[in-house]
Amino acid sequence: QGDITTLRCDAIVNAANSGMTGCYIPNHRCIDNAIHTYAGVELRLACAELMGQQGYPEPTGQAKITPAFNLPCKYVLHTVGPIIEGGVTRRDREMLASCYRSCLELAAESSLESVAFCCISTGEFHFPNEQAAQIAMETVKQFMNRNTGVKKVIFNVFKDLDKAIYEKLLRAD
């Protein structure tokens, strides 16, 4: 539990918005703002360049990689999680699983061995915390059972609620 921007690992995961250039609300407490703030303006510029080349908003469930610039990790993996409006649908669950899988696949392709995930979509995007944690754990477990590139996955939680949920799920596993 703690601040993902302080972790020394190969990559941390940013729960981004579809514009991918960070949160533009000053002092906003979202993970996207924290990562872009501590990484420095270079991260925002790198993301803007990626998005300019792409020419359209980042789809939900995919992943992009950038250098981490001023962060202690080496890279930032950016993914856009599903936004929940009303109840969680099967498609929402599939898209959230795709976020985790896409980040892990990109990490493996990039020869990264350690990845730290935040709780994708649970904050500003309103995915229920317990369901999101179950999807995260199951998706990562499935990936790790059949792939050898990524050796260490960290579930970095910020809230006490998420810590309790992950501890419960890890004990049950």
Regions found by a protein language model. Name each.
Residues 1-173:
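Macrodomain-like recognition of ADP-ribose-binding/processing modules
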